[in-house]
Swiss-Prot record:
PROSITE patterns: WD_REPEATS_2, WD_REPEATS_REGION. It is found in: Cytoplasm, Cytoskeleton; Nucleus. Its main location: cytoplasm. WD repeats lie at residues 6-45, 50-89, 140-179, 202-241, 244-284, 322-365. It comes from the Eukaryota. Probable component of the Arp2/3 complex in which it may replace ARPC1B. In addition to its role in the cytoplasmic cytoskeleton, the Arp2/3 complex also promotes actin polymerization in the nucleus, thereby regulating gene transcription and repair of damaged DNA. The keyword Repeat applies. GO terms for cellular component: actin cytoskeleton; Arp2/3 protein complex; cytosol; extracellular exosome; glutamatergic synapse; muscle cell projection membrane; nucleus; site of double-strand break. This is Actin-related protein 2/3 complex subunit 1A. It comes from Homo sapiens (Human).
Length: 370
């Protein structure tokens, strides 16, 4: 595991470039900072300044090398690099509330933006007018959209929202998409078609994170009631929900067809397993706790505590986990959702950690990624 403390401020969101030599992140304001790997150090290479509200989402397209950002100013920008300079192009989202989340489609010919306007803007490039336009998915969303993920077929889109529901929509756009083949989620896919809807019958919570598996037949989501759920379209959309004893999880990703990593307010990533019988189980926390050492306090530390915490007591407030505050995002760092070797987390503590499954398997007894 390698931890890098980028900021004192929270990292709102992050995205990696294709070869993982650069990371784009937002330091909880209206800017995007791009850091470049230089040996073992991360050096700030660019600052993207066009938004005038907090940035809420970043995604970096691996093939076309374009960055898309969205923010509380109700705007989205597509950034392209020319002669070493990042240039923004405004996207017409047509929303009257903050944008909350953005995600490129697998073929990078469109992207989806969630918002507080109770809708999803699916944006694509109109070459005859030379601009990005959007189509809206509105019904039956009843509240802010918090999270999105694309199906590998480039057409289906999963959305988690504050109305306690996780939904799968068709985001088929005839201008840019070929006619999609039938999937286990359904065969008729006109734009905006609701393919599946889960949760919300008097129970549940805000759906903070959603993730399709590499095959696209499974969908995982995490909710504010501390549950993890997986729906399996190949088993006639059977849903397995696991009520955990942890604080709510905020982000989730498949790391193999049967394994899911999620993280949130407990400050450490957790591994869950979904077997072929449709049973969802908690496997392990993926953070090895540091041993706290009892020792005398130096005068320097006593004064520092007076300054920082208005106390001279030796109360160790550091958490035993690597992250010292909630983890807000989990992303794949090495390989893909089919066979993830390393994954990355960023959090409110301003830190970024890269987790290596090989190292974790050797240090946590009985841990195996299925």
């Amino acid at each position: 595991m390698s931890l890098h403390q980028f900021l004192l401020e929270p990292i709102t969101c992050h995205a990696w470039n294709r070869d993982r030599t650069q990371i784009a992140l937002s330091p909880n304001n209206h800017e995007v900072h791009i850091y470049k790997k230089n040996g073992s150090q991360w050096v700030k290479a660019h600052e993207l300044k066009e938004h005038n509200g907090h940035i809420t989402g970043i995604d970096w397209a691996p093939k076309s090398d374009r960055i898309v950002t969205c923010g509380a100013d109700r705007n989205a920008y597509v950034w392209s690099q020319k002669d070493g300079v990042w240039k923004p192009t405004l996207v017409i989202l047509r929303i009257n509330r903050a944008a909350t989340f953005v995600k490129w489609s697998p073929l990078e010919n469109k992207f989806a933006v969630g918002s507080g306007a109770r809708l999803i803007s699916v944006c694509y490039f109109e070459s005859e007018n030379d601009w990005w336009v959007s189509k809206h998915i509105k019904k039956p969303i009843r509240s802010t959209v918090l999270s999105l993920d694309w199906h590998p077929n480039n057409v289906l889109l999963a959305a988690g929202s504050c109305d306690f529901k996780c939904r799968v929509f068709s985001a088929y756009i005839k201008e840019v998409d070929e006619k999609p083949a039938s999937t286990p989620w359904g065969s008729k896919m006109p734009f905006g078609q609701l393919m599946s809807e889960f949760g919300g019958s008097g129970t549940g919570g805000w759906v903070h994170g959603v993730s399709f598996s590499a095959s696209g037949s499974r969908l995982a989501w995490v909710s504010h009631d501390s549950t993890v759920s997986v729906a399996d379209a190949s088993k006639s959309v059977q849903v397995s929900t696991l009520k955990t004893e942890f604080l709510p999880l905020l982000s989730v990703s498949f790391v193999s067809e049967n394994s899911v990593v999620a993280a949130g307010h407990d400050c450490c990533p957790m591994l869950f397993n979904y077997d072929d019988r449709g049973c969802l189980t908690f496997v392990s926390k993926l953070d090895i706790p540091k041993q706290s050492i009892q020792r005398n306090m130096s005068a320097m530390e006593r004064f520092r505590n007076m300054d920082k915490r208005a106390t001279t007591e030796d109360r160790n407030t550091a958490l035993e986990t690597l992250h010292q505050n909630s983890i807000t995002q989990v992303s794949i760092y090495e390989v893909d959702k089919q066979d993830c070797r390393k994954f990355c987390t960023t959090g409110i503590d301003g830190a970024m950690t890269i987790w290596d499954f090989k190292t974790l398997e050797s240090s946590i007894q009985g841990l195996r990624i299925m």
